[in-house]
Each structure stands twice: as C-alpha cells, then as structure tokens.
C-alpha cells in the first residue's frame, strides 16, 4: 500500500474538535463502505500487514508523509491510540478513536455523495486525459487540495496498481469504464484526506502532552 503525500491544508476543518476526539474512546457505528475506506487508511500505516501498527511503522509512515516525529512524540502518540496497553494499535482501536472523524460526516462534502459524483459527469470520461483530470479535480477541490496533492495522489495510485489488474486502476488513459474510474479516484481522495487528518490528530495529541509535561 503506497503512502499519500498530502499537505496540512487538508486538516484545518477538523482540528478544532481534536480535544474532544482524543478524550472520547467509545464504539462507533460506521457504515460498511466507510469502514472499508478507513481500513485502507489503516493499511497505509500497517506496512507488514499483520493487523497492527507498531511504533516503528507509525514513524516510517509519518516520515514518508513529510513529518519528523522524535521518539518521545511517537511514544506519546502510540499511548494515545493503544487502548489495551499492548504497545501497538489494532484496527478496532484505530476505528474507535478516529472513526467518527474519518467517516463521511468528518470529510468535506465535496469528497462524497452527489457533489462529488457530479464532477465526473461534466465531461466525457472516456476521452479525459490525465492533465484534464488533474484540472477538473483541482477546480473542484482547490479549497482542500493543491495541484501538487492531486498529482501525487494520481501518480501514487498509478504506481500502486501496476501489474495488479484486479485492483481499481487510476490510469485514466487506459481505463475503459467510467464508473470504475470515478470510484477509484474518489477512493484515493478520501484516503488522502483521512490520512492527513490522522497525522494531524496524532501530532496535536503529542504536542499537547509534551507541553503539559513542560509546565
């Protein structure tokens, strides 16, 4: 599973809820389709695919996204996410803490539902080039994504699906089905937003604890 380079611009809408999010550790009721999208975000961190996020995997993922946490910050973040105290984070812990903000209720409206789907009916998707797709996505999501973000998402998804025909491709030059293309790009964007929010929550949690310890 590739890493998605995204910027802090994706995070701002949810940051004011972080203190409440960190203090509430209760079961969440998330639709199955949204749960699968959150599972994709979890896999970005779970590099060895064993179903757990270790401190080392967390550090690797964050550094790949441009963040440079030190060992103390990583330890604080893991402690925040690790509810059963086993030193690692499983998917249930991941969903319980972060699920409410990673479901559609916590993602900008343009990333899901009718608003998003409408974007893909403005033109002939069968004839859309990669550059045209980039421009279309930027015009629609410029409040949340830079052109560089969009290019990184498309490039990363193309690389991740090379030689994997059963997976949903983002290669818009060769993809022959409009619905597949639409679903795949939407999935990539939601995953990118989710990962950005996860990183923001983790860093804010670590900084809050570190500041408290300095007082």
Swiss-Prot record:
CDD domains: EFh. Gene3D superfamilies: EF-hand (1.10.238.10). GO terms for cellular component: perinuclear region of cytoplasm; plasma membrane; trans-Golgi network membrane. The keyword Repeat applies. Pfam families: EF-hand_7 (PF13499). SUPFAM superfamilies: EF-hand. Keywords: Calcium, Cell membrane, Cytoplasm, Golgi apparatus, Membrane, Metal-binding, Repeat, Transmembrane, Transmembrane helix. Ca(2+) 2 binds at residues 82, 84, 86, 88, 93. Its main location: Golgi. This is Calcium-binding protein 7. The lineage of its organism: Eukaryota, Metazoa, Chordata, Craniata, Vertebrata.
């Amino acid at each position: 599973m590739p890493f998605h380079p995204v910027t802090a611009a994706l995070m701002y809408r949810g940051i004011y809820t972080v203190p409440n999010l960190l203090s509430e550790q209760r079961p969440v009721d998330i639709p199955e389709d949204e749960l699968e999208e959150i599972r994709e975000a979890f896999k970005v961190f779970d590099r060895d695919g064993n179903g757990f996020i270790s401190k080392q995997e967390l550090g690797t993922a964050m550094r790949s996204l441009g963040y440079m946490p030190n060992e103390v910050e990583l330890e604080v973040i893991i402690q925040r996410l690790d509810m059963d105290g086993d030193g690692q984070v499983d998917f249930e812990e991941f969903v319980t803490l972060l699920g409410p903000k990673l479901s559609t209720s916590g993602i900008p409206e343009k990333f899901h539902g009718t608003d998003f789907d409408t974007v893909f009916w403005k033109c002939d998707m069968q004839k859309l080039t990669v550059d045209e797709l980039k421009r279309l996505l930027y015009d629609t999501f410029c409040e949340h994504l830079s052109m560089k973000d969009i290019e990184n998402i498309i490039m990363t998804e193309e690389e991740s699906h090379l030689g994997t025909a059963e997976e949903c491709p983002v290669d818009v030059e060769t993809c022959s089905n409009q619905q597949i293309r639409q679903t795949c790009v939407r999935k990539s964007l939601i995953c990118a937003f989710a990962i950005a929010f996860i990183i923001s929550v983790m860093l804010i949690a670590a900084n809050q604890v570190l500041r408290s310890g300095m007082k």
